[in-house]
Amino acid sequence: MKDRIKEYLKEKGRVTVNDLAQALGKDGSKDFRELIKTLSLMERKHQIRFEEDGSLTLDQKKKHEITLKGTFHAHKNGFGFVSLEGEEDDLFVGKNDVNYAIDGDTVEVVIKKVADRNKGTAAEAKIIDILEHSLTTVVGQIVLDEEKPKYAGYIRSKNQKISQPIYVKKPAIQLDGTEVLKVFIDKYPSKKHDFFVASVLDVVGHSTDAGIDVLEVLESMDIVSEFPEAVLKEAESVPDAPSEKDMEGRLDLRDEITFTIDGADAKDLDDAVHIKPLKNGNIELGVHIADVSYYVTEGSALDKEALNRATSVYVTDRVVPMLPERLSNGICSLNPQVDRLTQSAIMEINKQGRVVNYTITQTVIKTSFRMTYSDVNDILAGDEEKRQDYKKIVPSIELMAKLHETLESMRIKRGALSFDTNEAKILVDKKGKPVDIVLRHRGVAERMIESFMLIANETVAEHFSKLDLPFIYRIHEEPKAEKVQKFIDYASSFGLRIYGTASEISQEALQDIMRAVEGEPYADVLSMMLLRSMQQARYSEHNHGHYDLAADYYTHFTSPIRRYPDLLVHRMIRDYGRSKEVAEHFEQVIPEIATQSSNRERRAIEAEREVEAMKKAEYMEEFVGEEYDAVVSSIVKFGLFVELPNTVEGLIHITNLPEFYHFNERDLTLRGEKSGITFRVGQQIRIRVERADKMTGEIDFSFIPSEFDVIEKGLKGSGRKDRGRRSDKKEDKRKAGHSSDKRKHSSKDKKKKSKKPFYKEVAKKGAKHGKGRGKGRRAK
């Protein structure tokens, strides 16, 4: 019907709906309703448009108009950017040119103004068509509203990039205003109505429920904890233990001294190791991974759901697993003293850390001990009580530590980069309220297991690459020269000597930079800046190596319980072992799986960051008014981001500084025009917590003059345009909290109320100034 409508409009130009219905023979009541639905859909896709008099026309572009297709990234203040595939620079879209596009929409644009590299201005574009809406569901608390009696009320969403209200149709159930709802978008904002219209899909919970804030974030990203009934039914059919038949044809390693090393609270123990010295002076290392693919067969309900999720999601107070607990905490968990099916990479490693021989095969193991990182670290530190308790495996642990040193040294020599940035764990009570933020400590045990997982992943990837079979790789491409240049410029401002240009700088040169700043107050910040200059690792059917690890071959083999690519690798190991004829099948499915897994990983990271920001802001609400020593973590044109020792980061907006400040983009500094006070990344300063907003995840600080301040006289030539200025508006006063010896509270009874922050002011989409919590080991 759509083609007939288009042909008719093309011929007639402008027609009424009734004329169109008669021409198409759709003027009967049932056919007319079908026509109206089709027209509504075509209007949403910008294929037709309704004129002010109600008539219809084709929504055509101007002749000879060059258009581009891209993804729109909205800013909460109304403007946005459009990213084009394969292009480094984004197009700026002004508030009046957004044309009702929503963050994430696929859009068509025309160029209004070309970029001016001399002035440093971006190209400007206008959105002329929305090709596909990204937002189909929204989660938030219902606000009952009688202003529009046709609707039950509107949704209060955490998504700050949605500027228009979302009105909800009256559902069959009675609402009291405490419900957190998941709604489906029926109508998007347009010239006719500047708001969304949505229908209730589900009641996620109530505002008084414990942990509802985290659940709201997860549900808004379609990260769902509950598994479909068919998936749970399949999981229940999996036995509690492998049978003798299951073990047929497997290498039996149950007599090897094998054990797991994990965090104390880990339940899904999916990797175990064994080690022994060989007569020729080399070391045999066995990395044994739960054979999840034996139970999750291709095409099953379990497999389809695992691919849909593609990864487990780890947030502050919960895990949303890729697989049901029946598997992950049951038969696929390598618990001590029980038989378990595994896939193993058994490697002979020489004194230089090179794998000189290996076997990749299906095995059966029985772990001797369930070790924790703290236990292993204590043993290596000489704890006699622990060494006595685990005397059977102390020699193995000591040999593992020795091998780890060899492997780590090997990676460093070949150019692997190490980003040792602080990571924090947010501790919450039973109601989900944050009670403390503690730094994570990575000891020898944690780094040792990471070394073993890395070498196993490399060995498996190299094996299949050399067989020239279709395979899935974990790739990390070289960083863009533009981003590396910014890092070089900044590192040079500390007096560091840089060897090589941005397009040619070696990994060894980057290593030298990081070694040169070890122990300096700005070392962590510089490490984070280097990390931000890197591209994001992803999955691909093509092997492009792993820049961060300086590895020619890399994949993910070691965590099939929580990552789908690892599950696929296990499946390929088994299937290729039987016949190479399955190559054509894998060649077809791998690209889609790689894309899905990369996208789901990015979604998981976004969820983790959003929850972390929310919980950190909630934690800091109690400390508004307190003063702390902090470190400048990032400087931008509109202010400076400052990090506390517990990794909490906040913004000091330039309008809240006491004078004009010049921004030097090359050196990333802000310098006071009169006082000469200069802020640099890595510099220690004194701050006061002014505002913490759980809803937005934003934290505002103010600058307190102190003995840390650096004064640099003789300011040269920054233009007036880069200067910050005091706000001319009078600011409200409010009482500070009571003083506390422990918290070093300000002695003042009154303090300024901070202005609402303007984060990412005219910044490109995707710029991140806060630290995201990494997965730690096994996440590269």
Predicted feature residues:
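Charge-lined substrate channels and their catalytic hotspots, especially those that engage the 3′ end
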Residues: 1-286, 293-339, 370, 377-378, ...
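Electropositive polyanion-binding surfaces
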Residues: 22-25, 160-164, 169-173, 182, ...
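A short, compositionally biased micro-patch
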Residues: 51, 75, 85, 278, ...
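Acidic/polar residues at beta-strand termini and the immediately following turn/coil
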Residues: 51, 84, 157, 350, ...
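Short, flexible surface segments
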Residues: 103, 176-177, 624, 629, ...
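A generic structural signal for residues embedded in beta-strands
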Residues: 109, 183, 635, 687-689
